Amino acid sequence: VEIEASDAGEAVVAAMTAGGVELLFFTSGSELAFYQEAIAKARAQGRKAPRLVLLTHEVPALNAALGYAASTGKPAATAAHVDVGTQHYGSAIHSAMRSGLPVLITAGAPPVGMPGTRRGARDAGHFWVQDLYDQNGIVRQYMKWEHRLEMQDNPGLAVSRALQVACTAPCGPVYLSLPREVALAPLGRSEFPTAQELGIARPAAPDPDAIEEVAKRLTFASNPALVVSGSGRDPASVPLLVELAEHLGMAVVDSSSRSYHCFPMDHPLYQATIDLSVMDVVVALDAEVPWMPGPKAPSPKAYVAVIDEDPAKLKIPTYEFRASVRVTANATAALHALLREVKRIGKKSPERGERWAAVSK
């Protein structure tokens, strides 16, 4: 897209708008006034801009952004005041990392330009004490991507890249810090690709051979079970899982880290608790912590399949859960593929009715 922007801050807002951000959850700071001005100017000129939602603390701001992203599937954005606002995000930063949701977290940063040298340069004493060696380091290990906007950057491109990364599966938070003199730098005409023009990567399709193997194991299992946690992030997965469970007479249980409604809790095949040690086939679908290690964990002899957009859980340093196969796939796509395959196999186990009756007690 090509825009006329008085300063880099206007380009930041324009790129958010072009990237599908409709709400900016905002906690104010002296270096963040460019957001308010750019949004007000866009509205006055009849152009689209994110709606600025004012909050008085960063934890509810980021949690609100996560809730919006979870309920709509769209990216949300936040803005916080320099390093202290970034630290105020607190535990919500952890929630964002584990959420699988696209959120662009922004924060102002103090100017470092000497007084009088440029627009937005230091003009008050607090700017010296806000200056850190690495503000982004506060949240780096929790982010999919982070960047500090610099004078040589194309501000619209930086925002589009942030949204591209946040919205690419597995979705997650990204962080962009915006020094005041950079946000207020005169710009004029600016051209940049939108996040969609950069290209949001489509969810991975499951490996056909792996799906065939898992489907056969489930079809011919004596006691199959499926563990869920995050698959309900996409509501379309719920009826697919119900159909698969009913076709197989398969027990479904929430993992110890349940985060979404994945399966109807009043369905006869839903289990509040289950002893996985007696199951011969166990599938963990989008579940970070599928079960607690111990006597009720799957037997070493059981066939265990893990299906996830990040099946190896690369963000968790120590991860001891074993698996016979790990399949990289979006939960909804995997359920579609499994349903097709179990129907192709065509066999319904004679024990299916008995299993249904047993797990429904």
Predicted regions and their residues:
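N-terminal alpha/beta PP-like core and its mobile active-site loop of ThDP/TPP-dependent enzymes
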Residues: V1-A358
